[in-house]
Amino acid sequence: YVDWYGYSASVSPYILEQFEKEAGYRFRPEYIIDQGYYNNQYRVPSREFKDFQAFQRREVAKIAKEMVDITHEYGKEAMMFLGDHWIGTEPFMEEFATIGLDAVVGSVGNGSTLRLISDIEGVKYTEGRFLPYFFPDTFCDGGDPVKEAKENWITARRAILRKPIDRIGYGGYLKLTLNFPEFLDYVENMCNEFRELYTNAKGITPYCVKKVAVLNSWGKIRSWGCHMVHHALYQKQNYSYAGIIEVLSGAPFDVHFISFDDILAEPELLKDLDVVINVGDGDTAHTGGSIWENAAVSSAIREFVYNGGGFIGVGEPSGHQFQGHYFQLADMLGVEKETGFTLNYDKYN
């Protein structure tokens, strides 16, 4: 299986011993195995898994900093490639800045993946590696690298106007491009476009209509990565949900990612927002699952809407069967899902 955000490959006897000393309780294999789901981003994270994540972030940051320090001693910049598997080096969490990286580079698949890179703070610059890679599967007889390059650039370009990356590039075997001069011409034009966009957008606060927050179980740790399975690849089962995040990447909004834990810890944060978005299938981390059994959560959202805030639900927002409802905000949303338990309602003998 693939999981960029997974921690299942980060377990060792040494790590478990250290974790148990810090957390004060025994680590169990089930905390990672998670009924066979391995804590993928659709699973509502357990307290133990969140503890383990926090522990790994701190430990990985320490080790990564040692590597960065060695690099700096040799007078070189330290750059990290974002992607595939970044155990512990969570770019949107506080520990990341302590590593001391000079730059982050990542592969750009769409607007969301571009913002995943460009929104990272605590580095001197960010870089996007565009598609296609210079590999034989594209640069071959019958291949059309220009088409792929156009789709990639046009898809990601709108996000640059909201938050630009600092550099762009490609990866692969350069000699493969020699037989595709039209591709080289297109890349030249694309680079000129980028320079124009960057000159006008860098350091400028773009116009924002409203302040919007995506609400889920993860919050800022999964900023711009919501519903993203294996680098922006199309998934029939979730494209409508991932599409919401993609739209936000280039829309005129000040976008934030908040968790239910954030609301429980500081309900007042909702007062600074104009719109809250809850998007995904019911009983997943993206809509919250059993967290809606906590009256403090639903009360905070209701108060937010009562005071003029907007709430947008896509899919099954607040979806969790509890106390006679599937949508825990059914009264507020004006809609309910029939799950079989109320088929006998509104009927006559």
What feature does the model see in each segment?
Residues A78-L82, D102-G106, K124-Y133, D166-G171:
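Hydrophobic faces of well-ordered beta-strands that scaffold small-molecule active sites
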Residues R157, K163, D185-L273, G315:
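Aromatic-Pro/Gly-enriched surface loop or interdomain linker
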Residues Y1-L101, S107-L116:
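Polysaccharide-binding and catalytic clefts of secreted carbohydrate-active enzymes
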Residues E94-T98, L114-T126, I160-K163:
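Acidic (Asp/Glu)-rich catalytic clusters
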